[in-house]
Swiss-Prot record:
Organism: Escherichia coli O127:H6 (strain E2348/69 / EPEC)
Keyword flag Iron-sulfur: no
InterPro entries: CusB_D23, UPF0194_membrane_YbhG, UPF0194_transport
Keyword line: Coiled coil, Periplasm, Signal
Subcellular location: Periplasm
Protein name, entry field: UPF0194 membrane protein YbhG
Family label: Belongs to the UPF0194 family.
A GO term from the CC aspect: periplasmic space
Name of the gene: ybhG
């Protein structure tokens, strides 16, 4: 008669254990089983020449894989090569002028300037003496007023020539003014800047891939005359691979930077990729229409960027991805 209560008691204990275990499993799934839905981020870049010109050649076509540093296309280099030659010549001229300013005047030039002063002084002395004689003759009415005026003009001209020669000799002996040297230096620096710009323009007439990727579109063909900045290629960036997902505020504490997650695609549901949350948006936004969970579409959510650590070529941009949080994914 005592066995029946014992059996009932054991049944109650077992039932309580089952309920407790189920509750624990449910809670663990709630805490560690967060599932989000996102897409592989679409990352493209438009490539263009920084300078304008005629397209000489294009080395790749749509669908080609490209590598960072690879030559993708070239403009006609000739105009930029000519501009570079002109810039080099400009630097040579400016450098020579600056060197002359620094060196000052040679002894031979100073001697020539001194001789010119002596010659101008002699001419002035003669003109002054002649003018003095003409004044005496004018007083005795031997010459006309016109003759006296001509003598005065000759004297004044000789005086101006003498002053110019004296100023030139003074400049030669004292060297070039600091302002003239500074101006020559500025002209040299300007010519050097023009040379650097010409070198850069020639370099930029070759289009180099900035990173690895896949060529999506080829917008022009050889022979096209482009303005600077005109799009030549559109490239899909393949590395790193990012997944964009959204989490609501209730689960935001689980989606912290550094948290590791598993990423599932329809093509390989049993073999997940591994990812790590790299960025959580600091501001909330309304859920984009691309999110596949209807319950979230009217909520305010936070955007996540998840870096795929073992990405391969099977992950295509725009592909839907299921993001699974849990102990098996691990924590940073």
């Amino acid at each position: 008669m005592m066995k029946k209560p014992v059996v009932i008691g054991l049944a109650v204990v077992v039932l309580a254990a089952v309920v407790a275990g189920g509750y624990w499993w449910y809670q663990s799934r709630q805490d560690n089983g967060l599932t989000l839905y996102g897409n592989v981020d679409i990352r493209t870049v438009n490539l263009s020449f920084r300078v304008g010109g005629r397209v000489e050649s294009l080395a790749v076509d749509e669908g080609d894989a490209i590598k960072a540093g690879q030559v993708l296309g070239e403009l006609d280099h000739k105009p930029y090569e000519i501009a570079l030659m002109q810039a080099k010549a400009g630097v040579s001229v400016a450098q020579a002028q600056y060197d002359l300013m620094l060196a000052g005047y040679r002894d031979e030039e100073i001697a020539q300037a001194a001789a010119a002063v002596k010659q101008a002084q002699a001419a002035y002395d003669y003109a002054q003496n002649f003018y003095n004689r003409q004044q005496g003759l004018w007083k005795s009415r031997t010459i006309s007023a016109n003759d006296l005026e001509n003598a005065r003009s000759s004297r004044d001209q000789a005086q101006a020539t003498l002053k110019s020669a004296q100023d030139k000799l003074r400049q030669y002996r004292s060297g070039n003014r600091e302002q003239d040297i500074a101006q020559a230096k500025a002209s040299l620096e300007q010519a050097q800047a023009q040379l650097a710009q010409a070198e850069l323009n020639l370099q930029d007439s070759t289009l180099i891939a900035p990173s690895d990727g896949t060529l999506l579109t080829r917008a022009v063909e050889p022979g096209t005359v482009l303005n600077e900045g005109g799009t030549v290629f559109t490239v899909s960036l393949t590395r790193p691979v990012w997944v964009r997902a959204y989490v609501d505020e209730r689960n935001l504490d689980q989606a912290q930077p550094g948290r590791k997650v598993l990423l599932y695609t329809d093509g390989r549901p049993d073999k997940p990729y591994h990812g790590q949350i790299g960025f959580v948006s600091p501001t909330a936004e309304f859920t984009p229409k691309t999110v596949e969970t209807p319950d979230l579409r009217t909520d305010l959510v936070y955007r996540l960027r998840i870096v795929v650590t073992d990405a391969d070529d099977a992950l295509r941009q725009g592909m839907p991805v299921t993001v699974q949080f849990g102990d098996e994914a691990g924590h940073e």
